[in-house]
Amino acid sequence: MKKGTVLNSDISSVISRLGHTDTLVVCDAGLPIPKSTTRIDMALTQGVPSFMQVLGVVTNEMQVEAAIIAEEIKHHNPQLHETLLTHLEQLQKHQGNTIEIRYTTHEQFKQQTAESQAVIRSGECSPYANIILCAGVTF
C-alpha cells in the first residue's frame, strides 16, 4: 500500500500495486535481475544514486513488514549493514510496527528476486547492497 508520493512513475506504480506480503527488491548495480522480473533501472553512474538513497525513497512510500538481506553483507560490507539496520529501526518507529529481518545466503537471495514484483537497481557499487522488502498493510 502506498504511503506518500514519489516522482518516478515506475516506482510509484509498482508500490501502488503491492498487496500484503508481495515483495520488492532494491539492489546494487551488480545484482543479476531475472528476465521474468520487472526491472526499474535508476543507475546513472557508479554510486549514483546510492543504495540508501533509493531505499529511503522506496520506504517513504511503502509499508514494510519484513526485510530479507544476504548474510554475506555482515562480513563484506559491515558499514552498510549497520546503516541499513539503523534505517530499518527508524522505519519501524515511523510506521509503528516491527519489521522482521531475515538473513539468507546470497545465492538464495538471487533466487528469491525472481518472485518479486520488481527489482529497483541503484548505482551502488559496494558488495551485497541488496534488500528484499515485504509489503505490509497500513491498517
Curated annotation (Swiss-Prot):
Q: Where is the active site?
A: H20
Alphabetical GO biological process terms: D-ribose catabolic process
Q: Which residues bind substrate?
A: D28, H106, Y128, A129, N130
| UniProt enzyme class | isomerase
Q: Name one Pfam family in it.
A: RbsD_FucU
Keywords noted in UniProt = Carbohydrate metabolism, Cytoplasm, Isomerase
Main location class: cytoplasm
Gene Ontology molecular-function annotations: D-ribose pyranase activity; identical protein binding; intramolecular lyase activity; intramolecular transferase activity; monosaccharide binding
Q: In which pathway does it act?
A: Carbohydrate metabolism; D-ribose degradation; D-ribose 5-phosphate from beta-D-ribopyranose: step 1/2
User: What chemistry does it catalyse, as a reaction equation?
Assistant: beta-D-ribopyranose = beta-D-ribofuranose; beta-D-allofuranose = beta-D-allopyranose
Q: What is its EC number?
A: 5.4.99.62
Q: Where in the cell is it found?
A: Cytoplasm
Q: Which domain of life is it from?
A: Bacteria
Tell me which SUPFAM superfamilies the record gives. Answer: RbsD-like
> Reported effect of changing H106A?
Retains one-third of the original activity
* Any one GO CC term of the record: cytosol
Q: Which family does it belong to?
A: Belongs to the RbsD / FucU family. RbsD subfamily.
Known role: Catalyzes the interconversion of beta-pyran and beta-furan forms of D-ribose. It also catalyzes the conversion between beta-allofuranose and beta-allopyranose.
Q: Which PANTHER family match?
A: D-RIBOSE PYRANASE
User: Oligomeric state and partners?
Assistant: Homodecamer.
Q: What is this protein called?
A: D-ribose pyranase
* Organism for this UniProt entry: Escherichia coli (strain K12)
Q: Which gene encodes it?
A: rbsD
